[in-house]
Amino acid sequence: MSRLYYEVKISAENQEQANLILNSLLQKKLVTGGQFLKAPARFLWKGKITDMDYVTILSYTNDQHKDAVMDDVRKTTQEEVPMMTFTLPDDINKELRDWIDATLS
């Protein structure tokens, strides 16, 4: 059976939270690392439009670790609604697959 590889996006309300989340995942070897993408954000939250700066962690994992990533983020984040998405790329190059496997083993 082929392994599935995911591009992971995880939200954080600020850089401090993003660091805590990513460090926890890295210590457990659940993701390969991460880029921090900072941008202003706007949400409809509890009936009100809310503006804030947000950090998105962009990383990679595989199907073996997907559930553990979700569990760990839920334990680490301070967000009331943690936002995590796991996207299956249409294609992923061999070098990236090999690096993900080596990093997470």
Predicted regions and their residues:
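Positively charged, small/polar-rich N-terminal and surface patches that mediate targeting and assembly
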Residues: 1-105
